[in-house]
Amino acid sequence: MAVESAAVGVFDSGVGGLSVLREIRARLPSESLLYVADNAHVPYGEKSAEYIRERCERIGDFLLEQGAKALVLACNTATAAAAAELRERYPQVPLVAMEPAVKPAAAATRNGRVGVLATTGTLKSARFAALLDRFASDVQVFTQPCPGLVERIEAGDLYGPQTRALLERLLAPILEQGCDTLILGCTHYPFVKPLLAELIPAEMAVIDTGAAVARQLERVLSARALLASGQAATPRFWTSALPEEMERILPILWGSPESVGKLVV
């Protein structure tokens, strides 16, 4: 039986989920946090659904072994591939997952034209198609797969010339269509918001789902009487790649240096 003082386990294909972790920390400062970055297998966006499901199951098992009281799947691609299976596998804990912010974007657009930046895996998924059918039938949606962008962010290059050139190329079709609203459909992408702001019209709305996930986590923990109170424990981090590489980038993306454990699953 999970207890209030147990930690929340958060995982992603890499460091992108840190954007969600920051939102959770801001909204729920009493919650102790566990974070797994599957950097040895990043990006998930070009991999098969079966491969992604296997990785998610291994990481989910690991986080539950660490005593997690809830899981947050901080990856749009993994949500599309594995969320339903993970909920069946872990009925004993709440699982909060990600999906592109199609509903709020459809409500926000003024001219009925919405652009989406996401991974190939997310854009090709049945889950994304269902979101469009359900919430975006009255708007035009222009999707743009973003190969290479996750890798730039994983390298900590949030503002350099290579990342700028890549974003300019990826944004061009969306800007040509006159979209007034942009969905960031990958948890890595909020880290390049400052650069995006230089490349898009000032009036263009940019929507991601990190804050919404933190709110949903608060709701599900409250419903199960699992909200923590008091002082949170120091967050714990693991990576399936080189710990020293993640330790190098954590001050940039998380805001403070942390020690990182090696995940072998």
UniProtKB/Swiss-Prot annotation:
Substrate binds at residues 12-13, 44-45, 76-77, 187-188. The keyword Heme does not apply. Its EC number is 5.1.1.3. Pathway: Cell wall biogenesis; peptidoglycan biosynthesis. The keyword Isomerase applies. Keywords: Cell shape, Cell wall biogenesis/degradation, Isomerase, Peptidoglycan synthesis. Pfam families: Asp_Glu_race (PF01177). GO terms for biological process: cell wall organization; peptidoglycan biosynthetic process; regulation of cell shape. The active site is at 75 (proton donor/acceptor), 186 (proton donor/acceptor). It catalyses: L-glutamate = D-glutamate. It comes from the Bacteria. One of its GO terms (molecular function) is glutamate racemase activity. Provides the (R)-glutamate required for cell wall biosynthesis. NCBIfam families: glut_race (TIGR00067). Belongs to the aspartate/glutamate racemases family. This is Glutamate racemase. It comes from Pseudomonas aeruginosa (strain ATCC 15692 / DSM 22644 / CIP 104116 / JCM 14847 / LMG 12228 / 1C / PRS 101 / PAO1).
